Amino acid sequence: MVKIRLARGGAKKKPFYLIVATDSRKRRDSGYYIERLGYFNPVAHGQEVRLTIEKDRFAYWTSKGAQISDRVKQLVKEFKDPSIYEKRVAT
């Protein structure tokens, strides 16, 4: 099963997360993921971008049945576009 979740990166005490589509059986920080969908920088200051999501790829994976983690759902709402994680019917 494919999941959309966060993968931690960055240095000690300076977290940085990738939003990735990955196999649910893999560990969070294994380095293995199918596709990078964006990133989240929780310690962004000033003009730094805090959150970036590729909407079209996110929509593609959710339409294929990927499960979304709770934290990523919260981030999508913060991104102010909750429609991108709604289930879409493949045509």
Swiss-Prot record:
GO CC terms of this entry: cytoplasm; small ribosomal subunit
InterPro entries documented for this protein: Ribosomal_bS16, Ribosomal_bS16_CS, Ribosomal_bS16_dom_sf
Coiled coil: none
Pfam families named among the record's database cross-references: Ribosomal_S16
Any Gene Ontology biological process: translation
GO molecular function, one term: structural constituent of ribosome
Transmembrane segments: none
Keywords: Ribonucleoprotein, Ribosomal protein
UniProt superkingdom: Bacteria
Family of this protein: Belongs to the bacterial ribosomal protein bS16 family.
Official protein name in the record: Small ribosomal subunit protein bS16
Naturally occurring in which organism (per UniProt): Ruthia magnifica subsp. Calyptogena magnifica
